[in-house]
């Protein structure tokens, strides 16, 4: 129920449970239907509601909600009006589309609840975004916000009194995971007790599933918020477990609550074309797991004679002639370089930047701030980062996950009531796998965008 089968090692591995051999204790997520679990086991299940002592804090909000959705999400998180029963809940899910300012809503909740807080993100560069947002939306002095890295953790464990000056902690999953691997998860339990937080917030809560569960098992925090634009996992097996873990957790679901206009400023182009791959080329894009998107990315930039021609149609008409800031997503770092070289050769005056793990952080920031055409991978820039004034996203990747498409189009933030943005997907119909992948996610697209234009 809470484990998945590892096809590589031919074994089942725990995903959302933890077993302590010394005490013979099995820990499972509190968000499950515990009465049903008790029925299955034929014995009582203890609901551990013992929480750490936390410090109250005073943080004043300096901004206001800019939409009815934001206002409702804040009420949901703090338990006001129609959501008053949430005031007694220890776990809440905030599921709203990218660009709807979940960050602001969470910061507003911190202010209203007056609890010392820890925010856990999945990437280091997002730490600064949260610190900047707290600085922007509240009166809190930046010196009261702690970037909880390994060095700071060691200081706190040596001298817990230093946490008194901090009101908010921001850290990454990797930081907690690496310290747990080094010292053990019980040591993490001590850390959370020492920092005296009453509220724990996960950003992009669908990303680090196993680590998030382990933190929950060993943190004993009064309240936890799970924020995401996609409360699901890409893997069918993992998503089945994921949904069980949050079955009993109240969920603010933007779409189900009727807020369906978050992407009505986006027109989608589905550009279907047939690159006429040979049997050998189709075979080369497969492995034992199925379709290989990295091999396909190599095929695009080396053998697909139509690929750059189609890309150029959009870049010439919208990026060069109309001046749109543009993001092109491919699957590999080498493909990023190939795309940049192609456009640099035909548009020498166009500012083009590459954003991926091979680029240092200062250059990455410069690319986000300055370049008109950005080439990246979805793993590097598919989520979380904000690109100011972005008008066009061209997604060249082969992918099955609805989440990936949602995150990619989510880079296109609303720029004004009358300003349209454009999301393009290239669908090579010469590959049956790519046709099938698009068909799986097409139904969701029809509900999201203002319109979908099919190009054949």
Language-model features: locations:
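Conserved two-lobed SF2 helicase motor
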Residues: 163-182, 368-383
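Post-DEXD/H (motif II) to motif III coupling segment of the RecA-like Helicase ATP-binding lobe
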Residues: 199, 204-265, 445
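Conserved Walker A/P-loop ATP-binding site and its immediately adjacent core
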Residues: 98, 112-136, 331-336
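Conserved RecA-like P-loop NTPase helicase motor core
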Residues: 357-444
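N-terminal pre-P-loop "Q-motif" helix
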Residues: 63-90
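Conserved interdomain linker/interface between the two RecA-like ATPase lobes of SF2 helicase motors
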Residues: 251-326
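Conserved helix-turn-beta segment of the N-terminal RecA-like "Helicase ATP-binding" lobe
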Residues: 125-152, 346-350
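Walker A/P-loop
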Residues: 84-109
């Amino acid at each position: 129920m809470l484990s998945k089968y590892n096809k590589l090692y031919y074994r089942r591995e725990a995903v959302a449970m933890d077993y302590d051999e010394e005490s013979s204790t099995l820990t499972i997520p509190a968000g499950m239907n515990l009465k049903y679990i008790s029925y299955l086991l034929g014995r009582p299940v203890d609901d551990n509601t013992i929480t750490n002592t936390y410090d109250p804090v005073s943080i004043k909000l300096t901004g206001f909600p800019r939409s009815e959705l934001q206002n409702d999400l804040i009420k949901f998180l703090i338990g006001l009006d129609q959501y008053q029963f949430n005031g007694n809940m220890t776990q809440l899910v905030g599921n709203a589309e990218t660009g709807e300012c979940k960050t602001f809503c969470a910061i507003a909740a911190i202010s209203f609840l007056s609890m010392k807080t820890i925010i856990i993100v999945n990437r280091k560069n997002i730490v600064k975004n949260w610190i900047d947002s707290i600085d922007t939306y509240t009166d809190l002095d930046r010196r009261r916000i702690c970037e909880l890295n390994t060095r700071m953790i060691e200081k706190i464990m040596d001298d817990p009194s230093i946490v008194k000056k901090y009101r908010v902690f921001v850290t990454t999953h990797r930081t907690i995971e690496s310290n747990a691997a080094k010292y053990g998860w019980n040591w993490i339990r001590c850390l959370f007790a020492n920092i005296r937080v009453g509220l724990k917030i996960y950003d992009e809560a669908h990303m680090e599933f196993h680590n998030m569960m382990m933190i929950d098992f060993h943190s004993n925090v009064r309240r936890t918020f799970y924020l995401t634009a996609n409360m699901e996992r890409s893997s069918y097996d993992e998503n089945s477990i994921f949904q069980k873990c949050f079955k009993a957790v109240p969920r603010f679901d933007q779409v189900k609550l009727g807020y369906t206009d978050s992407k009505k400023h986006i027109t989608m182009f589905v550009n279907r074309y047939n690159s006429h791959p040979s049997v050998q080329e189709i075979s080369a894009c497969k492995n034992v797991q199925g379709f290989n998107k990295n091999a396909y990315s190599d095929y695009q930039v080396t053998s697909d004679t139509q690929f750059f021609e189609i890309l150029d149609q959009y870049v010439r008409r919208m990026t060069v002639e109309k001046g749109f800031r543009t993001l092109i997503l491919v699957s590999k770092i080498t493909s990023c370089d190939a795309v940049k070289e192609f456009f640099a050769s035909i548009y020498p005056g166009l500012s083009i930047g590459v954003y991926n793990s091979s680029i240092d952080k200062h250059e990455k920031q410069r690319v986000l701030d300055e370049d008109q055409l950005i080439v990246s991978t979805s793993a590097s820039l598919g989520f979380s980062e904000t690109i100011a004034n972005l008008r066009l996203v061209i997604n060249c990747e082969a992918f099955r996950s609805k989440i990936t498409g949602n995150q990619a189009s989510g880079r296109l933030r609303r720029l004004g009531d009358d300003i349209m943005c454009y999301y393009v997907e290239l669908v090579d119909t010469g590959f049956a796998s790519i046709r099938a992948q698009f068909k799986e996610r097409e139904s969701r697209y029809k509900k999201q965008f203002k319109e979908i234009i099919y190009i054949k």
